[in-house]
Design a protein with these regions (language model features):
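Short low-polarity hydrophobic stretches
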Residues: 112-113, 148
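Basic, Lys/Arg-enriched alpha-helical interface segments
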Residues: 1-107, 119, 130-162
Length: 162
């Protein structure tokens, strides 16, 4: 069964933080990448033009850095860009530095992705979500991670059906 890669030397996050890889996107039932869909939804929430341009630049840089294996993995969940999601088996979380103002609240942004163990160098984007700070944000984040895990499982099933 496909699972999150746990590299013998580098552990979790080996591709995004050490070896590099290439991106594919998990897609919805209409074939639209979740990453594209969620970026569009975020744009529709009246994010300011300046924040939008900064977000695009940061996401593009994050994706390039992961492809090159230049992100920082942190299993303490406090300092690095990438960590393993605690509540899911197959999901990694990349924290964006930028926060955006939505409806008068600063929101933290997270890219959820996986590094499937059975496809060499693959970085699979699962979701780009935003959350509040504090405990309510942690509850939102748990929901986002659970959704990303379901998307990973769906991606695995779709591959098997082909």
């Amino acid at each position: 069964m496909t699972a999150l890669l746990h590299h013998k030397v580098y552990g979790y996050g080996a591709r995004s933080c050490r070896c590099g890889g290439y991106w594919k996107n998990a897609v919805d039932n209409r074939g639209r990448p979740y990453l594209t869909k969620e970026m569009s939804e975020l744009r529709a929430r009246n994010i300011s033009e300046d924040e939008w341009q900064m977000l695009l630049a940061e996401v593009q840089q994050l994706l390039r850095d992961a492809e090159a294996g230049r992100l920082n993995y942190d299993n303490s969940y406090t300092k690095g860009v990438v960590c393993r999601a605690q509540s899911a088996h197959d999901v990694l979380e990349a924290r964006l530095e930028l926060t955006v103002n939505l409806d008068g609240e600063q929101r933290h942004l997270r890219l959820y992705f996986s590094e499937p163990d059975d496809e060499d160098r693959l970085l699979l984007s699962l979701s780009l979500r935003h959350k509040r700070g504090g405990m309510i944000g942690l509850e939102e984040q748990d929901e986002h991670i659970a959704s990303a895990q379901r998307r990973f499982e769906s991606w695995v099933q779709t591959r098997r059906a082909k």
